[in-house]
Amino acid sequence: MKQPQTESNVLKNGLVGAFYLIGLQIISRLFTFIINTLVIVGVDDSIFGVSAIQYQLLSSIILFLSREAIRRACTRVNITDKLNNDNNLKSVINLSWLVLPIGIGLSIIFENFFLYTSTKETLEILNYHYGLRLFTISSILELLSEPMYILAQNLLLFKIRTTVEGFALFFKTFSTYYFIVILNMGLIGFGYAQILYSLTLVIGYFGYFLINIINNNKNKDNKEFSNCFKSIDQLFPKFSTRIDRNLIKLSLLYTWQSIYKLLLQEGEKFVLFFSETNQGQAIFAIVSNLGSLIVRFLFLPIEETCFLMFPKLFPTINNNNNNNNNNNNNNNNNNKNQENNNNNDDFKNGANVLIVIMKFLILVSLVFTCFGPGFSHLLLNLLYNNKFRDTNAGVLLGFYCIYVGFLAINGVSESFVHSVAKEDQLKTVNWVLIIIGFIYLLFTLIFCKLFQNIGIILANCLNIKLSNMIPNKMVLLSFIISFIITNLSNKYIYNAVSFKSTCIHLLIGIICFIQTCTFIYLKEWVSIKEFKKILSNKNK
């Protein structure tokens, strides 16, 4: 059986996993971004708006509410522990398969919700209902792969996720271009591409575990999860085995956090669905996808890796351990003192990792906050051949770049709190998050009425608090100066129809970027060395 993970191994595997996920995001997203740019130029705005906002919102609701809480609870269980492996593994398997019936029930409810609440303009779009049904089916298929995904994540098999999701994204991108641009199938084409994506996930994850079980039975050495699984039956639920109560409680606690996270990540789509035209939805979807590239490239993989690392880097105290310790207090004082010393060292090391990661993300986000607004118009005009020159898409993208700065801090800090908090702390956090989530929706609706699409991004910024881990003052000053100069250049120098003014605007941006990077190197060298030191652990 796989050996329990030490702190150094967890950090090593976590960092390697982060690099695999970041690599997957960069390669796949750049490829899909190029193809999607061609799709956007060739498809009607209304069709793209329905697909990118309404269909994706339906899929997100089904997937989030079905699997997010169970996924987070299961990743906190150590199925490689020698003493408790069998019980833990059975509980994780049984609980992970509950996502399927939950997802089917939610699919029926929310598909009908979208049909009854859609506008007359939307319902008149060709094959709207058929496309909606295809996205519902694809969501259920994706949930079918969830038990194997949870096992792969729990065992820190990041290579498997990188490979499977990479192939799935490539198939989805190629099929989208084929169905939409070549065959001109409209909304049905988006649905078919989504189903191919889900099928690839199912085949990939199940195929990996089935092949390894067959190899284990043939007495072949398997270093990935040595003899953790000996038969195919272990991958499926057993009604004779009960799910651990603590795991169920943890899942229920994370359910409230899933609702909050859904409101945070998809709240703007709810507001757009009820208040914007299909064309307005399309513009926001394009800007959102473009503006959140850094989030998908870098922030999201690091956030997911941190959620897997922190429970193992920071010692957690559960109710069972407390009860066992109370019964043996008089006999194990020396052991407890030693354990407390080890826990203190673990907390120091874990805290150092957290601080360095946060500082790095803040610096990256400041680059986008500083240079994004000044070059958003130019980027959109270059990518989409001036298709959105007469809209507010450029201003919207500029505000989205500022929003990215808030996202950088929120993701990792949220992963830390949710992965190491005790049960009573999670209960308190849940109620606070739910209240904040509904307040956020209220702000989103109000700002959307006042500022249209830009108001949605302003509401998002209010929902996320800044940390006190800010960079050096000179670095901040260089960012502020660059921000002012590039935006003045964008307003008074840049002209979309003038090649000369475009080149001058780009040159100003390059000069400002170089001077900002110079200050980062000079004033944040200590943080850079600490970050390098953490990265070097992956080779040890």
From Swiss-Prot:
TM spans (from-to): 15-35, 46-66, 95-115, 140-160, 166-188, 192-214, 282-302, 353-373, 393-413, 431-451, 466-486, 502-522
Region of interest (Disordered), residue spans: 321-343
This protein's pathway: Protein modification; protein glycosylation
Localization (cell): Endoplasmic reticulum membrane
GO CC, alphabetical: endoplasmic reticulum membrane
Membrane topology qualifier: Multi-pass membrane protein
Family: Belongs to the RFT1 family.
Listed name of the protein: Man(5)GlcNAc(2)-PP-dolichol translocation protein RFT1
